[in-house]
Amino acid sequence: VRIGRDVIEVSTYRGSDTGHQEPRRGRAKKKILPNNVFGRREEDVLRRDFTINALYYDPVKEVVTDYVDGLGHIQERRLETIGDPRERFSEDPVRMLRAVRFKAKLNLRLDAKMEKLLPRMAGTLTTVSPPRLFEEIIKVLHNGHGAVGFQALDRYGLLQFLFPSATRHFGEQDLNKTNGLIPCALRNTDQRVADRKPVISPFLFSVLLWRQVQQASRMKSGGNRSIFENLHSSADGVLQELHPTVRIPRRISAVMIEIWELQIRLEQRRPRTIKRLLSHRRFRAAYDFLLLRAGAGEVSDSLADWWTEIQEMPPTDVQRMIQGLEQSKPQRKKSTRRKRKHT
């Protein structure tokens, strides 16, 4: 329900579904939750996940009904499940991601039993459908507190089950809290959310999978294929490997590949392509990515500074900078071989 610029989410009361107590399994043995069964408010409260998420507001009487001490837990800044957390997480493992999201966004303290259970039950995330996990990851990383949320995913052992291959490729350049690629990208995204600026999910996912794609591409180098062919082949392989866990929609992955490809072109700085790159629809995202890589020590600061400077220049100075590149490029030697005469 929209009220001015605010959005209030409304849900129906759900009752107990005696005919479908357990989630059914899809073809890939992933959990498919049963359809909603309408019920009374007293039934609905027992189906909620956390106490702070089980408050009922009457907009006419302006009264909040609290059956499970949710208001008290909010005041104590404590997150508790309704009932046994093991049972709640078994019913729907996505609740573990929701716990991390609430903790990060609202600065809550997790119940001690819940904290112990998260690492033990993290593996049950593999039973959740890949498209649903993609949506839940977006909610954790795009709510304005993604940096803290990512740390919590890592701390509780959830991250390795969301990105099993990518996490094995993470190194100091990726995870360093001061200038690592991922923490800096998440802090920048958090700031954009705070400033009410748009954020795009392809950017963060391109950062998260970059190291794996980069290393896979390097392993393919040296053959007959171009650097761009190797990149596309590696990107396809990485995304395909991730599919059973987290399924990134094609509309997202296509943008990710564009951002990765532009990293190569920005590093090459070929004079004939500079103006075309500056007008590329993904240039800004690729440029921001390049700045993060420079901060992490992956590319030189001078390269990042050059691309920063050329964007601020008038057209005549842009041409001068491009000419400077042409003059600095080593000239190819003309072939001295004589052309063969055909008889």
Predicted feature locations:
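Catalytic cores of the polymerase beta-like nucleotidyltransferase superfamily
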Residues: 1-343
